[in-house]
């Protein structure tokens, strides 16, 4: 499973839209979309926030 697939899976388990996750991370919805398609990777600070949000 790729990082993007994992982000998408965790987001969907929370029943969140990409927009909701983006707001929680202070990024654009497009950034979340790129991550989920593995076209971009979150920066370290965003990875740490993702870990906190989904733990």
Which positions does each model-derived feature cover?
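Alpha-helical and His/Cys-centered functional microenvironments
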Residues: 12, 22, 33-34, 45
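Recognition helix of helix-turn-helix/homeodomain-like DNA-binding domains
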Residues: 25-41
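Helix-turn-helix DNA-binding elements, focusing on the entry/boundary residues of the two helices
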Residues: 7, 18, 29, 44-47
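Short basic helix-loop element that most often maps to the first helix and adjoining turn
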Residues: 5-24
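A detector for short, charged/polar N-terminal pre-domain segments
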Residues: 1-2
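DNA major-groove recognition helix of helix-turn-helix/homeodomain DNA-binding modules
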Residues: 45-55
